[in-house]
A protein has these predicted regions:
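Positively charged n-region of N-terminal signal peptides that target proteins for export
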Residues: 1-7
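Helical hinge/lid and interdomain linker segments adjacent to catalytic or ligand-binding clefts
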Residues: 4, 32-36, 43-131
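Bacterial N-terminal signal peptides
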Residues: 10-22
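Sec/Tat signal peptide C-region and signal peptidase I cleavage site
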Residues: 23-27
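Extracellular ligand-binding/catalytic regions of CAZymes and related secreted enzymes
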Residues: 28-31, 37, 57, 64, ...
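Active-site rim elements
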Residues: 45-46, 126, 153-155, 173, ...
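Catalytic beta-strand/loop cores that center a nucleophilic Ser/Cys/Thr
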Residues: 63, 145-224
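A glycine-rich, often tryptophan-bearing local segment used as a flexible ligand/cofactor-contacting loop or short
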Residues: 97-174
Length: 291
């Protein structure tokens, strides 16, 4: 029996006994969620690709749900891989395009493969959704999609005001943003197990854009595990948007096999709290215009 199956049985048992816990049964072991932060460039605009700041904030938000135990890993990969033991889900908020530390060594790939086979949830955020072509097989198997030479990326404005009936969408309110997106991904054959959640392109931000515009999705994997991916979150300021914030927290908890409350998972945060997690940076020197 994999981790997802055990967690599902815990929830069913709690429901049958009338235990009032929306996420996990009171008294059960907490759901361990490992947050892997990509290394943050020291010289860069404050908030840009602040993977560590984002993971620290996500840990604080996840703690608002009873029975959840977030564990933070800094700088790409843990010094001791034992941190993954017993994890209900693993979150990667890192650079992509082959820069992922989890893909840099056969042993690390095997470690993630083992977690996936055991039914652990997997969440990929922002550039972490972009595996290099050499790892397209893993990308499809783990997340249900792959970034290809035909895929696209860029910054543009988009509005998001309607969401499908899925647990990850619970309590998600509309938002508008100029974000850095990756879209035009290649999905598994027949979109089997895929549920699109958010769409974005330079010309729109809704379902009419179809498969090419998908930027957030869930994947019910054939092994019984769950994956959630979202290609936004280029800048730390995006966390100020409650709708986006709840989508991500819901997605992580859902990937861990947890039931999402009807109003969505709690994710209260004001600007002061969000900014308190910013990683100190040295701004890059101003660009000098050529004469």
């Amino acid at each position: 029996m994999n981790r997802f199956s055990r967690r599902a049985l815990d929830f069913v048992a709690a429901f049958a006994m009338g235990v009032p816990s929306p996420l996990v049964m009171n008294g059960a072991d907490p759901a361990k969620i490992v947050l892997v932060a990509g290394e943050v460039k020291q010289v860069d605009k404050p908030g840009h690709h602040d993977y560590l700041g984002g993971c620290r904030l996500m840990a604080a938000l996840l703690r608002q749900s009873e029975g959840v135990e977030p564990v933070l890993v800094e700088k790409d990969w843990p010094a001791d891989e034992a941190v993954f033991e017993g994890a209900e889900a693993v979150v990667f908020y890192t650079d992509g395009g082959g820069k992922q530390a989890c893909l840099s060594h056969p042993g690390r790939i095997a470690r993630i493969e083992d977690l996936v086979k055991q039914g652990a949830g997997l969440t990929l955020l922002h550039q972490a959704v972009e595996f290099s072509p050499a790892f397209a097989k893993q990308s499809l198997a783990w997340s249900g999609a792959a970034y290809t030479p035909l895929s696209a990326r860029g910054h543009w404005d988009s509005s998001h005001d309607s969401f499908p009936g899925h647990p990850v969408s619970r309590g998600v309110i509309p938002w508008k943003i100029n974000d850095g997106w990756l879209n035009r991904l290649h999905f598994v054959d027949g979109m089997t197990g895929i549920t699109p959640l958010v769409w974005s392109s330079k010309t729109g931000g809704g379902a009419p854009g179809g498969t090419p515009d998908i930027v957030a999705w869930t994947y019910d994997r054939p092994d019984g595990g769950r994956s959630f991916s979202f290609s936004g979150l280029d800048a730390h300021a995006a966390w100020e948007l409650e709708g986006m914030r709840r989508l991500v927290i819901n997605g992580i908890l859902w990937s861990a096999g947890l039931e999402i409350p009807a109003a969505g998972a709690p994710c209260a945060a004001d600007k002061a709290l969000i900014d308190s997690f910013l990683t100190p940076r040295t701004p890059p020197p101003p660009k000098v215009k050529k004469p």
